[in-house]
């Protein structure tokens, strides 16, 4: 409150919206290969250097954008601020307009220190683990989805060079009936560049995420439109 925030929510809510749209795309039978659209760095890489692969990139909002859209539909006039470990989200926020400001954890920490804000201990009761909380780890998008009996193969790729190799393989037409989760950061979002000294070793961080997630689903109101026109 001291910094001007009225509420705080998990963007795992937005992740739940996005993974639901991915499930619908697969169930529709209209897509042969689908690339996840959550990582803006991957999206930008495809848009700039591999435009022939754009038809395979899911035309679905990222969790950040989907969550911000829901917040604004439910709270007209609200200013939506995303906070995370990703620098690329700043450009994404500027491009699409759903998110008013994208901050990194490092920027938030500096702001709190400047304002003399000391975080209080977590007083909330733990809830049932939610699938959407898997998103920030490698394979987490897939882990959040219902993948049984779809006829699709689910693959997770992380690291820029691995993503480029996967994109070239898709471009060659070698893959069929595949959903491919792509993250530019090795280890996915929990290994993002702007976490500062709070950064945990990769495996320890993944263990924490898995312990916080689970099989339950967030009960979310789907936004009026979850699709975006890729610029």
Give each language-model segment a name.
Residues 1-231:
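Iron-sulfur-associated redox domains of electron-transfer enzymes in respiratory
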């Amino acid at each position: 409150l001291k910094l001007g925030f009225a509420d705080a929510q998990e963007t795992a809510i937005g992740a739940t919206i996005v993974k639901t749209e991915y499930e619908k795309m697969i169930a529709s039978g209209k897509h042969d290969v689908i690339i996840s659209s959550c990582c803006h760095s991957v999206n930008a890489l495809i848009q700039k250097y591999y435009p022939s692969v754009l038809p395979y990139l899911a035309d679905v909002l990222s969790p950040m954008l989907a969550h911000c859209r829901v917040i604004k539909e439910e709270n007209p006039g609200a200013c939506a601020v995303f906070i995370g470990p990703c620098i690329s989200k700043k450009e994404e926020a500027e491009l699409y307009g759903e998110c008013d400001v994208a901050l990194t954890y490092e920027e938030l920490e500096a702001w709190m220190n400047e304002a003399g804000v000391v975080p209080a201990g977590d007083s909330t009761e733990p809830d049932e683990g939610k699938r959407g909380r898997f998103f920030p780890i490698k394979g987490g998008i897939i882990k959040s989805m219902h993948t049984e009996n779809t006829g699709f193969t689910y693959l997770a790729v992380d690291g820029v060079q691995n993503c480029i190799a996967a994109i070239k393989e898709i471009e060659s037409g070698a893959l069929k009936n595949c959903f491919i989760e792509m993250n530019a950061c090795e280890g996915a979002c929990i290994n993002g560049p702007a976490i500062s000294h709070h950064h945990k070793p990769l495996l320890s961080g993944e263990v924490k995420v898995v312990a916080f997630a689970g099989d339950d689903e967030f009960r979310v109101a789907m936004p009026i439109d979850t699709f975006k026109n890729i610029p």
